[in-house]
């Protein structure tokens, strides 16, 4: 997230750099589930990176329905993305699709609920959906989580705003994507704070008892 402003079609140097970094992380963490996302909406590039680096999943923007993002209009990509995944032999790479994505306006689909968006992503063969708040570090709506869980059978991930204080609101999620809270002072651009990570995971362990 350090190359703002993002472009809709990032250059090949971005894909190359991300592939090298992803491969290095995979080598360091051979048994941990790993994924990649490339902004902005560079989902085919992410699939290629994941295949080359031996990753397990990507996070995809604009999988179903169009929306207006900071970078402009992002159109649905499910058909092209799944065909590309098959074409390069990457069908083992799972696709977790953002729904009603953060940092975006959804007036174009104001008559489509978040649950309906999730159902469409499931119909279009997403392996899971990602529910977020309105921006990085902003919490998702727990009521929307319940609605989406009721609407689909695929995994539902919460992808923003999870903290030590509010994680109990998201225990029904199948997975959590945590960035900001794990950084120093809880700010997304800072370095990871091992103490915050340790404290959070200890709290999760207690909740699981």
PLM features per residue range, with description:
Residues 115-132, 138-155:
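Internal alpha/beta core interface subdomains
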Residues 44-125:
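Conserved anion-binding
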Residues 164-204:
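Long hydrophobic alpha-helical segments typical of transmembrane helices together
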Residues 1, 37-43, 63-65, 98-104, ...:
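Active-site beta-loop-alpha junctions enriched in small/polar residues
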Residues 58-59, 130, 177:
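Conserved beta-strand positions in the central sheet of alpha/beta enzyme cores
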Residues 41-54, 117, 148-178:
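Catalytic cores of alpha/beta
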Residues 6-36, 75-97, 140-163, 195-209:
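Alpha-helix-loop-beta-strand connector modules within alpha/beta enzyme cores
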Residues 1-17, 65-70, 126-140, 185-187:
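Glycine-rich, proline-tolerant flexible connector loops at the mouths of alpha/beta enzymes
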């Amino acid at each position: 997230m350090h190359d703002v402003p993002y472009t809709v079609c990032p250059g090949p140097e971005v894909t190359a750099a991300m592939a090298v970094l992803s491969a290095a992380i995979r080598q360091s963490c051979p048994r941990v589930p790993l994924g990649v996302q490339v902004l902005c909406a560079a989902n085919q590039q992410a699939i290629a990176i994941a295949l080359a680096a031996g990753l397990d999943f990507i996070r995809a923007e604009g999988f179903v329905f169009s929306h207006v993002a900071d970078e402009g209009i992002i159109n649905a990509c499910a058909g092209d993305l799944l065909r590309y995944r098959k074409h390069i032999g990457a069908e083992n790479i799972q696709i977790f699709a953002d729904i009603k994505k953060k940092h975006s306006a959804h007036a174009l689909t104001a008559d489509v609920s978040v649950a309906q968006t999730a159902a469409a992503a499931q119909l279009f063969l997403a392996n899971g959906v990602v529910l977020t708040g309105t921006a990085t570090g902003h919490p998702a709506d727990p009521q929307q989580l319940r609605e989406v869980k009721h609407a689909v059978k695929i995994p539902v991930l919460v992808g923003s705003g999870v903290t030590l204080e509010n994680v109990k609101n998201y225990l029904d999620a199948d997975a959590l994507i945590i960035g900001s809270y794990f950084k120093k002072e809880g700010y997304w651009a800072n370095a990871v704070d091992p103490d915050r990570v340790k404290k959070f995971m200890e709290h999760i362990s207690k909740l699981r008892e």
